[in-house]
Every structure is written in C-alpha cells, then in structure tokens.
C-alpha cells in the first residue's frame, strides 16, 4: 500500500514518493507571534502534527520544520503599542504558543527556526537573486523580486501572470516595476528594528524568510511544504518562485494546504476580529473536543465554527471519554491484547483511510464505532473483546491522531534485584502450595507493569516495552 496526498500544485491526488527513501522532509508555516493563537491558527498545527505521526507510524523518519515569524509589521506595531522591544513581544508569544501547543497535545517539530536568527543567510540569498537578475534594488533601499523574470510564476496557485491583479495580500508601491513584485528586503523606517545589508539598514521581507529557513534545514529540494490555503497566494507562490530562482532546482515536491475555519461567513482572522483563542477553547470544551472538531472534517475542506457546534462536539467527545473511563474503572491496568483477525482488519481500515489523502473523518467514524462496541463488550462481560477496542481507540488511532490517547499504566522500576527477590519469595510460596498469596503477588506485579509467566522452565518476567510514557 502507498500513501496518497493531494498536491496543490498539480491539483491531483499523488503517490507520496520521498526524495530519500524512508525519509520525509516537511516544512509547515508557523505563526507570526504577535498575539495568542486562535482556532484557525491551530488547524494546520493539529492536522500536520497528526500527519507527521501517521508517517512515523508507517515507518518513515520525518524531519519536520515549523517556523516562527518573529519580525513583522504586526509585531512592530504591537511592540510600539506596549512601549517595548519587538523581541519582547515575539518572546512572549512564542512562550504562549508553547503553552497552547502543550495543552492541545501538539508535538514539537524537529526544528523551530526564528526569522531573526537567519538574517545573515537571508541577506546572502537576496544578494544571489540580485546577481542572477531575479531581483532589483529600489531607490529607497528596498529590494524586490521581479516576477516577470520567473517564467513559472503562478504555477502553484494556478494563476497566469497577466491575469493576476495586485490585491488583498499584495503590497502596492510606486517603487516596484510591477505591482506583483514582492519585497525581499525592506528599507528601515523610523522606529523600526533593522539589520545591516549592502543596500542599507532594513529587515527581511515576509516570503524570503521561509525559503531560506526551509532550505537551510531541509536542503534545496525537500518533500512537503504545508500550511493554510490562505497562504497559497501570494506567500507560497512567492516562496516557490524565489527558491527555484535561487537554486535552479525544484523547491517542494508536494504542497499540502488545509481549509480555513469559517465563522459567520468569514475566515477566522485576528484582523477581522472574529477569533476564538485556543486557550479559551480548551478551557471551555476540553482538548479532545477541540481536536475532534479540527479532525472531524477532511483537512482540505473549510470548517464552520460556532459555539453551538463546539458544544455538540464536546458532548460527542465526552461520550468517548466516558466509555474509556468506564473501561479503566472496570479494568484498571489494561495490557496489550493479543492480535487477531478483528484487530488486523480494523487497523487495515484505519491505514486505508489515512493513506487516502489523510482522511481523518473516516477514522473518527471508526473511533465512534469502536466506542459503541466497547460499551457492548463491557455490558456482556467480554474483557478481551473490550480490551481490543480500548487498545485500538487509545493506543493506535488515538496515538496517531493525538486524540483520546492513553498509555499503559506502569509503575516504573529499573531495579531488577527487587523484582527478582519478590519472585523468589513467590516461588517459595508456590512450593508450599500457597497459591492464593502467590497469585496476589503476581497480580500486584502486573499492576506495576511487570508481566510474569510461569513456565515448565521456571518463572520468567519482563517489563512491557510498549508503554507510552
């Protein structure tokens, strides 16, 4: 079987074939850190964290980069409003991002570069683009990329250069040769932070930062570039143009984009003022309900947000959580069940769904199906059947999607001598036919995560290596 994903550039579902067999290198556009993240910001973080987990589950080594844009007009404006340095604003909201990420159970990427740590490399990249005639210096010291010099401009977004009109996210300036030319370097303005460059003091443009950081950490050509669909144009289009102009090589092999969170007909956005913060959502509805909301629709489709929808999602999540809690009260120390045809078939359905363009709604449906069957198995006293379903929900499906996760409950000990002494006492009890106490010791060790087996060759024991710590 193979993994298929929709590539924005081709508009088609394509088989994932990494540049290096067994290794997937992916870059996910991260937040501009001038405020707390909202549900819309959280969607790509949750979706592509889960996608990375699935790739790892399928045996890939994943090298993931997610950036922080820590210098930007919005950050500067926020710093001026506070009367502090821009770095104080960025540092504050990066720290707050990590709190929200932890509360949502989002794993860190392998690298989280910050724009200001790569200014030297950005200047070097801009110099090369000027030398190759893809960029020009304006009279005021701005440096712009000339889109007409890059013949494939518009390929990612499916737009023709002659049809493009400078619009909502394109900065218009008389200094440009073409309205669609975009800034690689912005000349310093009064009250702004700046860095030295051959064209005078200034700071990086928005698009060049992601090109430089991704290529420095993943190489000139890597596998997957991901982010929200609102970034396709101009941000990702501009990234692709300047990166390929710089190296003469393909930039990202696959482009994945998630749909927007919609509220009252508009995209959830700080600029519109219709945001709902992640921390407020987790506090009101719970982590699992928030992630259930974000994963219940296919990642490429928009999701309508309202408190009524979230309330209903919370009720659905609580049904699952109550079932899991009921199981844990009934069977406090569940181990790993024996694999059988049922488990293999369910896991095959799980894999089939996620290999088909990461179809999380199908997996969510499987979780609800398993939860219903889990309740039935408990009602009928079928412990092993219940354990299979609990295990699939919490340690397979849940572990990959980052939702309803549970690990094996283990009291950790590395003290082999203590365990051996306990087993020695138990063996003496068995010789004296005091099986009742011997069995109590066995059960106590099992609850502590020590599995023992009485064989014809004596008693053997092991710590469960599948514990999710």
UniProtKB/Swiss-Prot annotation:
Q: Where is this motif: 'HIGH' region?
A: 31-41
Please give the GO cellular component terms listed in this UniProt entry: cytosol
| Xref: InterPro entries | Cys-tRNA-ligase (IPR015803), Cys-tRNA-synt_Ia_DALR (IPR015273), Cys-tRNA/MSH_ligase (IPR024909), Rossmann-like_a/b/a_fold (IPR014729), tRNA-synt_1_cat_dom (IPR032678), tRNAsynth_Ia_anticodon-bd (IPR009080)
Q: What is its main location?
A: cytoplasm
EC annotation?
A: 6.1.1.16
Residues given in the record as ATP binding sites: 270
Q: Name one Pfam family in it.
A: tRNA-synt_1e
Where in this protein would one find the motif 'KMSKS' region, according to its record? 267-271
Q: Which SMART domains match?
A: DALR_2
Q: Which residues of the sequence carry a binding annotation for Zn(2+)?
A: 29, 210, 235, 239
Name the cofactor(s) required for activity, per the record.
Answer: Zn(2+)
Q: Where, per UniProt, does this protein localize?
A: Cytoplasm
Q: Provide the GO biological process annotations.
A: cysteinyl-tRNA aminoacylation
Q: Highest taxon of the source? A: Bacteria
Listed under catalytic activity are: tRNA(Cys) + L-cysteine + ATP = L-cysteinyl-tRNA(Cys) + AMP + diphosphate
Q: Which UniProt keywords apply?
A: Aminoacyl-tRNA synthetase, ATP-binding, Cytoplasm, Ligase, Metal-binding, Nucleotide-binding, Protein biosynthesis, Zinc
Gene Ontology MF: a single term: ATP binding
What remark does the entry make about the cofactor? Binds 1 zinc ion per subunit.
Q: Which PANTHER family does the record match to this protein?
A: CYSTEINE--TRNA LIGASE, CYTOPLASMIC, CYSTEINYL-TRNA SYNTHETASE
The record's comment on protein family reads: Belongs to the class-I aminoacyl-tRNA synthetase family.
According to the record's subunit comment, the protein's assembly and interactions are: Monomer.
This protein is called what? Cysteine--tRNA ligase
Q: Which organism is it from?
A: Thermosipho melanesiensis (strain DSM 12029 / CIP 104789 / BI429)
């Amino acid at each position: 079987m193979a993994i298929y994903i929709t590539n924005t550039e081709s508009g088609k579902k394509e088989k994932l074939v990494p540049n290096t067999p067994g290794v997937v290198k992916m870059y996910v556009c991260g937040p501009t850190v001038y405020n707390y993240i909202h549900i819309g910001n959280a969607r790509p973080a949750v979706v592509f964290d889960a996608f990375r987990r699935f790739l790892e589950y399928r045996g890939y080594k994943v090298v993931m980069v997610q950036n922080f844009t820590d210098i930007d007009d919005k950050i500067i404006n926020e710093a001026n409003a506070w009367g502090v340095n821009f770095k104080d604003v960025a540092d504050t909201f990066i720290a707050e991002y990590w709190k929200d990420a932890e509360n949502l159970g989002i794993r860190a990427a392998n690298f989280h570069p910050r724009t200001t740590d790569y200014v030297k490399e950005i200047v070097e990249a801009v110099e090369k683009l000027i030398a190759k005639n893809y960029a020009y210096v304006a009279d005021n010291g701005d440096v712009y990329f000339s889109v007409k010099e890059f013949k494939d401009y518009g390929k990612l977004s499916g737009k023709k250069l002659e049809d493009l009109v400078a619009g909502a996210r394109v900065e218009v300036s008389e200094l440009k040769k073409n309205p669609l030319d975009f800034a690689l370097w912005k000349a310093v303005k009064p009250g702004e932070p700046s860095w030295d460059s051959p064209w005078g003091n200034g700071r990086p443009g928005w698009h060049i930062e992601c090109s430089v950081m991704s290529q420095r950490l993943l190489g000139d050509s890597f596998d997957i570039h991901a982010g929200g669909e609102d970034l396709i144009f101009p941000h990702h289009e501009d990234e692709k143009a300047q990166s390929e102009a710089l190296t003469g090589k393909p930039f990202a092999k696959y482009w994945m984009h998630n749909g927007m969170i919609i509220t009252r007909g508009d995209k959830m956005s700080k600029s519109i003022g219709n945001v709902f913060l992640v921390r407020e959502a987790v506090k009101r509805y719970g982590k699992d309900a928030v992630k259930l909301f974000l994963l219940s629709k296919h990642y490429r489709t928009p999701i309508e947000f309202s408190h009524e929808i979230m309330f209903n999602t919370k009720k659905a999540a609580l049904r699952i959580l109550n079932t899991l809690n009921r199981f844990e009260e009934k069977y406090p120390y569940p181990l790993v069940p024996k694999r059988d045809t049922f488990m293999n078939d369910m896991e095959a359905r799980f894999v089939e769904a996620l290999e088909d363009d990461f179809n999380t709604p199908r997996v969510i449906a499987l979780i609800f199906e398993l939860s219903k069957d889990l309740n039935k198995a408990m009602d009928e006293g079928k412990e092993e059947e219940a354990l299979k379903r609990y295990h699939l929900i919490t340690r397979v499906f849940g572990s990959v999607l980052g939702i309803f996760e549970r690990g094996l409950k283990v009291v950790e000990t590395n003290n082999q001598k203590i365990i051996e002494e306990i087993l020695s006492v138990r063996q003496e009890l068995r010789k004296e036919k005091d099986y009742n106490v011997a069995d109590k010791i066995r059960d106590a060790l099992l609850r502590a995560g020590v599995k023992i087996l009485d064989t014809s060759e004596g008693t053997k024991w092991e710590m469960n290596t599948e514990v999710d710590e």
